[in-house]
Amino acid sequence: MLDPIAIQLGPLAIRWYALCIVTGLILAVYLTMKEAPRKKIIPDDILDFILVAFPLAILGARLYYVIFRFDYYSQNLGEIFAIWNGGLAIYGGLITGALVLYIFADRKLINTWDFLDIAAPSVMIAQSLGRWGNFFNQEAYGATVDNLDYLPGFIRDQMYIEGSYRQPTFLYESLWNLLGFALILIFRRKWKSLRRGHITAFYLIWYGFGRMVIEGMRTDSLMFFGLRVSQWLSVVFIGLGIMIVIYQNRKKAPYYITEEEN
């Protein structure tokens, strides 16, 4: 089993979980700032947005997680803010981040769809890296399996939990998001019929579908009235993505790749 603590500085423990999230954030900010000028968005506005959105998204992710496990946290109030032990629900962070983005874009007079479109692939790569935090914390795993011989030894050993090998669902989602990120990069450079909002829609559909399937393999999912909350939200994401495509096509929204960029 790998030590979840990456660096110990006296009483201060820096966990791999935090490093994975921060690394994903840094890469996401870099990629978004690099794409921003193409949509006539000032890169410094991206930094301003992150300074506001990131802490609020973390808070939203934690609040979402605590709400659906309130029976436990109501008896352990001191653990509500112990995010270093894990327990961040990505959907809570995404919903909070989207709300902050809408308000921020409106105040900065930035087209919301343009902002979402340049942020979507960056969010996907951040999620891909962030899932490795679950790996180090031994969480977000799946059902028991006989063996994991197809995986590298360090992953196989870390997925030996409570006397059994577990499906590395963190890895499946990480790779799924990485593939989605690569496809978005290809689409936005090569697909000339790509309209404003289509990248956001692709993200919602791609991530929603992958999460819905992978969530069914997990054994530690948040439950609500006997159902997996994330699977219901995945259906909402997919439906919303389809609606965005239909709406933007009927509206004849501007193409993502403009004539000047061809």
Swiss-Prot record:
Q: Which function does this protein serve? A: Catalyzes the transfer of the diacylglyceryl group from phosphatidylglycerol to the sulfhydryl group of the N-terminal cysteine of a prolipoprotein, the first step in the formation of mature lipoproteins.
Give yes or no: UniProt keyword Membrane.
Answer: yes
Report the EC code(s) recorded for this entry. Answer: 2.5.1.145
Bilayer topology: Multi-pass membrane protein
* Gene Ontology biological-process entries: lipoprotein biosynthetic process
InterPro entries in the record, alphabetically?
Answer: Lgt
Q: Which family does it belong to?
A: Belongs to the Lgt family.
Q: Where in the cell is it found?
A: Cell membrane
Q: Which PROSITE patterns match?
A: LGT
Principal place where this protein is found?
A: membrane
Give a Pfam family name.
LGT
- Which pathway does the database say it acts in? Protein modification; lipoprotein biosynthesis (diacylglyceryl transfer)
Instruction: Provide the protein name.
Output: Phosphatidylglycerol--prolipoprotein diacylglyceryl transferase
Record-listed a 1,2-diacyl-sn-glycero-3-phospho-(1'-sn-glycerol) binding positions = 131
Which species does this protein come from? Streptococcus pneumoniae (strain Taiwan19F-14)
Molecular-function annotations in GO: phosphatidylglycerol-prolipoprotein diacylglyceryl transferase activity
Q: Name one GO cellular component term.
A: plasma membrane
Task: Enumerate the transmembrane spans.
Answer: 9-29, 41-61, 80-100, 109-129, 167-187, 197-217, 226-246
Q: Which UniProt keywords apply?
A: Cell membrane, Membrane, Transferase, Transmembrane, Transmembrane helix
